[in-house]
């Protein structure tokens, strides 16, 4: 605590999550200073200095029972959270306090949640591929080690299930440390995730930070920074960390909720005018340096399935790979419902992924694109009016579409079939056989919900 620790102020106004506090004029708190309500653990974070000793703050917790005249103390420092190994295997809230009833977190090191992004000369771009074991992702939008990935999708198309499968496949194979930030999502999912990690014996390598749907906007606004601070510490120690955020949209939404109360004019669609800056501050910190790497996977909710909405649109520019989940594909019963024509990755370059992988990816996309163009003709005139080449393209495209589906480990309860991890070599071999016409004699249903191409051949024998 600094010398300003003893400075006291009084609450002069409460509007929802935004609280105004008056301090002596000569000792106004700095922006982002943490203030503590006298006699309780409630923390306020300074957002604006209104002048005349009055500061406007966001309440990080429920503001029930607050009234004018209550005493508030200035800690003189920004919010600091415990970092390092003692956080592993623990569930914490936005202030780094344990919420898993497993005793205090014995961490000697604390770090402010507001840090500067690494300088440009410290950054370390990576082209090494990170195998996920999910066919559609490894083929169409491969991830880079130390890269940033976004899972975009509307309500109920499978963002969280996809993220859980990625955590299952990468975190277990990866063997390093992971940080999971639950930002404004369902408490049930947080609970499921905790037990999933516990059952698979990787809980002692994961730090969990939650600020869920039922919490005030201040918590949801800052919880992503809390998780990121913990991940940054591991990175600066020279480790390779995985950082999962579910859901980045709720971070934006929490900012929108408090923006109007802070007296800012809303911008497009009612979002805060500082949307790009807030997103930039967060995203620029999620990066790999010469010391260590942060590989991040972020779920991004797409309001009303509109990818041009300011929130997802702002997120797009920061990512290395975008996995777009489509309602049309989900409605066909193809899961993961990844849109192979909309999803992209900066790694799709023959110099990075190799000539074979690159050409197979492009051939698969061309076949699917041709099928998309022919769909209207098929709907009106039927398949008989197509040329033999087009008929072949359609047949192969439908097989590719089904082969892009895959049973997940985390969805075994729903599908009843065991999950499959498909190595990248097998994925490339399978799709090469389909586009080369080596599977033209097989029925398309043989490709649905299988792992490798060999399983499709086995399934075809049973069908025939």
UniProtKB/Swiss-Prot annotation:
Membrane topology summary: Peripheral membrane protein
Disulfide pairings: none
Organism: Burkholderia multivorans (strain ATCC 17616 / 249)
Protein name: ATP synthase subunit beta
Protein encoded by which gene: atpD
CDD domains: ATP-synt_F1_beta_C, ATP-synt_F1_beta_N, F1-ATPase_beta_CD
Top-rank EC class of the record's enzyme: translocase
Catalytic reactions of this protein: ATP + H2O + 4 H(+)(in) = ADP + phosphate + 5 H(+)(out)
Keyword Cell cycle attributed: no
